Amino acid sequence: MSLRFILGRAGTGKSRACLDEIAQELKGSPQGPPLLFLVPEQATFQTERALATMPGLGGTIRAQVFSFRRLAYRVLQEVGGSARIPIGDLGKRMILRNLLEKHKDELRLFHRSAGQPGFADALAGALSELKLYNIDATSLDRCQTEVIERQGAGLLADKLHDLALLYGALKTFLEGKYTDPDDYLHLLAQRIPGSVMLRDAEVWVDGFAGFTPQELSVLAALMSACRRVNVALCLDPTELDEPCDLDDPFFRTRETQAKLLQLAFDRGIVIEKALHLVPAPGQSAPRFQHPELQHLESFYFRRPAPPWLGGTQSLFVCAAANRRSEVEGAAREIIRLCRDQGYRWRDVAVLLRDLESYYDSIESVFSDFGIPLFIDSKRPAPHHPLVELIRSALEAVLRDWAYEPVFRYLKTDLVPLSRGETDRLENYVLAHGIRGRRWRDREPWLFRRRLTLGEDALSEFSDQELAELAEINGARDRARAALASFHKAVVGAKAVRPITAALYQLLVDLKAPEQISCWIAEAEAAGRIEEAHAHRQVWAAVIDLFDQIVESLGETPLDLATYAVVMEAGLDSLKLSLIPPELDQVFVGSLDRSRCPGIRAAFVLGVSEGVLPARPKDDGIFDDKERERIYALTGLELAPGSRRRLFDEEYHIYVALTRASERCYLSYPLADAEGRAQLPSSVIARVRELFPQVTERTWLLEPGSLPTGAGLSGSAFAGAATAETAAMAQTALAARTTKEAAMSAVERELAEEYIVHPARSLSYLIPSLREALARRPVPLVWWAVYSWLAERPAWRELLARVLSGLWHKNREQDLPKPVSRRLFGDPLRASVSRIERFLACPFSHFISHGLRLKERRIFRLAAPDLGEFFHAALKQFGERLRRDRLDWGALPREELFRLTGEVVSDLAPQLQNEILLSTARHRYLTGRLQQTLSRAVIVLGEHARRGQFRPLALEVGFGPEELLPPVQVPLTGGRWMDLVGRIDRIDGFFVGDASWLRVIDYKSNRANLKLADIAHGLKLQLLAYLDVALRHGNRLLQGCALGEDRPSSLSAATACHPGGMLYFGICDPLLSTGGPLTRDEAERAILKEAKMCGHVLADPAVVAAMDGQTRQGYSPLIPVGLKKEGGFYSASSVLTMEQFALLRQYLQSIVARVGEAILDGLVSIRPHRRDDRLACSFCPYKSVCQFDLLLQDNDYRLLIDDPPEKIWEKIAAGPKAIFEGVIR
């Protein structure tokens, strides 16, 4: 029984010496006593591989590789102690959460923090630390007593009391049934003397810089039980007799050697002569193939140190703009090494101190470059379908089958629905607001959306509707079956075990195990071994999570909401530990845990200030001062504090600088992910000090500008087709003499650095091709890249797609006239809003009315729904007044409120499948709608009281099978266009045998109408409605029901004149005043806010018929101001009879031109821009047209608001000048 050290600095061959000695033993006696190689957990696979590939060994069972944890499993299986149920980290946290609640009255300090997120994690970490350092509850009690005796009660004493209490409670809970994995090494140390396997065994220990007290106990037991224990440590054997300071990189290993020597001395273990691995004078260590790297290893931590004279060929310092360019630069250099220097992927390692920040960039960039890699890091699995299924199933039950969790559940591909069925089901659910009971009951869904409010419900479904409903209900039954059973099982459950059992039954009902097995088989068949392994691990981890929850909380009373929180924490903690799927791949690891022996080139990324060396975090139960006080007062040793961990960073730096045998790259980004400037680490400064002429590089994301040299002019390239361009480039290259075509040194350097992978080279090629399109010269190297890609079938298609993007013009070709007429109909039938849409952008009109694309319907109360509701309500209100022969202006307020209440009660259930009755919020909104409607009818009543205009018709339709015929607009070639629509309200005023008509359009918010709006074609509705009313005025007058107000002089010959065209905003305005108002003042202010907008006839008599109480000043009802001496203020919105006539002619011209353009197939992408208002702002088809100002053919059609005089001139000239950009 003896102890022997194998000592040497980095690269001297310590690991190789261990392997060689094991190999020698195996060759000498293949059947002898066991040979154990003890290494860190993360190094077991690499060490097993190294041992298995030792030349001349073949298969053996005598030599085995173990980590401390794996050795514990093996020994406990042999001598007993492994039968108890292990409790993992999650189980321990849940147990501690229960113990905190159970003992909260006894806790002195922790009761305040017990419910805080993360506290149970911190507490579990503290107890694990105590176990690793062999401190039990009794020791904590003694420590607390000594602290109180020597410095009195306080925060530290209370911490120690609570920790001792919870430590003891945890031990009592686990005793006799469960095993804490943190106790495995303690049990191992106790069981080693009884192990037959370890008798006469020889042990090699390698890869450790230090050991916890638990691990030291195991090593002490091994020294007593085994024939010999060999421990390899990284330190300088020539400096063993010299003092070692805390900032020495070998301080930790020197300290570790001292502890092992003391353990051996205390147990009477023979200490053999150490094996010192020291290079001969003037020679490099076996690892380092270049003296520069040996110089770096020898002198980095020595001061003063001789600088390296001359440049470097194996040491490089690289600066990058950001992390992405840093990773891409490393990827390009790795490919260059493998392409030009004979490296294999496995000869390269990428090392980082902060792997998490670089993880996503490395994974995506290396994949783009085609570099196989293995990232030595446990990966979270929060987005795996199985994890998402569990999370969303619990959330669906808790949120009463709300849309979001239900469809996250259905989209996991673990539910027996195809993706198409899921999409159709989702559309139906969104359109009808289905949730809760409607999902769970067995009644079939027969919802359908009404087209307009107030229509009678259709009694029968069409055959197509029945088929669609049958498909929807079939998909719904399969979607709900398993989840409904789960819901029924867990709703009444009050303990952990039945809820977990129901969750497992849900997976069984869905046949999740079988589906995951299929995914594994598919992945393996496609060669995606890593993906298959991930599926296996996730399933195993989820089942283990269920076991942990049941074992730790079992019959603990827990409601479903709390259970979901516990399960969420467990799912978030799932990590995937992946074994390298290939032998030849780049290794990516972190400096503090990964081992990567035998590499030729190391890329150390992220060598930035604050990252390497890393800033220690002090986030445990004990801070640094408390750790020092505990040690000073009681002698109990805890884990190193942040100050000591900061010095340990020096060892990580030493490891990083000495991993590679041939090349070491140190790189740093100049900015972080948010664009903030970052400084290089002190490591960079020290390397520059030690190597004044170190080779420095800059890694750019894309190649910078180059001299064009013998580059091919882009003028010939511009506008050419793909095949023509290929021939052109080939001809140009072949035609040049050798001297002319030779690449410059700069270009060749560029080619060597950036042209390393076809896909990435193609992305770098694109900017150069853009330069060619702009008729600027392009460096010859990019034409060479172009030719290489064009000559190879594997890349030719991708190149063609890229080039098609360069020539892409986002410009739609007009439709052939026969196609357009079949698509839009001939004769064309169009509403005024359709005309306005075309004038806003022809392509938007094509999508909405040609292809008839519609946005997905969603069960919510949007602005159009409110508009529809108010239109229907005012129509119904007006019809009731007409039916009961009531005068709008004479009704008292109480009667108005009663009538609006009845109207709202009648219409509310009809809006979107009772949306206004669906929730308390919507029921409250119904009351607000009634209040707004009441305010509107009060204002309209004021119009009736103060004026003489009376409603002639409400909701008047014009078109086929409507009250009024469509407006037939003649087009060229004998064609015509039918203009159709619906007018909210037409009012009339009569004097003798003449009448004046005005049209009113209801808006759910305030709207304005400027002359420029009409001129630009943006707001034509009011003008078109007035034109229709005037065309059919006599028919309206004959059919109206004015009752006693109907003048006897009305006849078919009555002349109809334009009275006005007005918007009425339906709103309940919120007043902003400087002080309190009386009731009358408030009413006047509200009336002013609800003033109609638009244009009225410039006739005082007509104005008086609209507001007879305003003799001078501005009317509170209409947009008119009267001067005292007569006439109108300039701000009045009035038009003369001639101007109304001119606008009507202008309207006819616009409609005719638009009709011609539609039937001629005009579908151009030409949105307008008016000041800062864009046609695209509220267009639902932006993703379809892909309008982009960066594209040459995409630009806005600018609309400029001219002064009124100039607008009238243009209106008189017709629409040609104004709509030149839209209509040909």
Swiss-Prot record:
Binding site for [4Fe-4S] cluster: 841, 1176, 1179, 1185
UniProt xrefs under InterPro entries: ADDB_N, DNA_helicase_suAddB, DNA_helicase_UvrD-like_C, P-loop_NTPase, PDDEXK_AddAB-type
Domain UvrD-like helicase C-terminal: from-to ranges: 283-584
GO BP annotations listed: double-strand break repair via homologous recombination
Entry keyword Nucleotide-binding: yes
Domain UvrD-like helicase ATP-binding span(s) in chain numbering: 1-326
Cofactor(s) this protein cannot do without: Mg(2+); [4Fe-4S] cluster
Known EC number: 3.1.-.-
Subunit structure: Heterodimer of AddA and AddB.
Misc remark: Despite having conserved helicase domains, this subunit does not have helicase activity.
Name of the featured protein: ATP-dependent helicase/deoxyribonuclease subunit B
Natural source organism: Heliobacterium modesticaldum (strain ATCC 51547 / Ice1)
